[in-house]
Amino acid sequence: TEKYRGILGDAVDYVTVEHIDKDLKALGHKIDLWHTTDQLFIARRHAKGMINLLTVHDLNFLHEKKGIHRIKNLLKLKWFIKRSDCITVISEYVKQDLLKHVNIGKKPLRVIYNGIQDTTKEAQRQPDFVNVNDKFFFTIGQTRKKKNFHLLIPMMKYFPEYKLFICGKRRTSYYRELKEIKEHCHVDNVEMVGEITNEERNWMYAHSEAFLFPSRLEGFGLPVLEAMRYNCKVFSSQCTSLPEICKNHATYFDSFEPEKMAKTIKEGLAEWDKNGELALAAKEYSMSYNYDKYMKQYIELYKELLHSLN
């Protein structure tokens, strides 16, 4: 349906349909391989002689949900895997998490990292909420508790000369919680600015003093790599997939205690030069996550799976 348009990025062409089974049958073609590119997607096909490939992005529900909701999501994933012939995951972390909680039997399981669109040559626009002389830190993501944005608010007491802009949806309970924490901490240099456009996001990456990402649950960690492409210093948690994705191109928080987080940032910024070797190395590393490599790996896998039909 139209609501999924753009979900895989701007580099993909989209065809909007309302009734996938009906529309696919109308094409009159035999489908040899069906790739469900996200375990959350509703669109699925099963037929005799058809190979089913499933991509699992994360098992975050195991850590976010409780009781019957947790069990329901796990059973659903197990059922999808049972009906799949091959599984891909987006990081080694997700692979190990999957193997820990789901018996996949002898089904092939492969890690294929996400490709990332290069936006560095795309349009940029300074957001209205940023003043000309502002020195600022930046973070962006789903406004959910797993992102740990609340840890950054008391830390900003140690950076009176900087602002922190938290970008993400306003209509969540966690957003309201962030506002309450800000009021309780009496911090006036933190702004929750809501969602921003792609052009504004690009500008923020390019002009931020640092990108802060204390998330505790990630299957991959797209924003950290996006930030690196703009020579932006990245500070990250050591949770889940982030050390695997950032490697030595980020500085990691050893503690979530505000003063220690601030110390980590100050030390990291002291050795950072946007045009220096560390920044250029991080950018080059980030560029290795591209759609050419991503598509090449999937095309090779498609050929391998289709060859097994013959």
What are these model-predicted stretches?
Residues 1-310:
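Carbohydrate transferase catalytic cores enriched for Leloir-type hexosyltransferases
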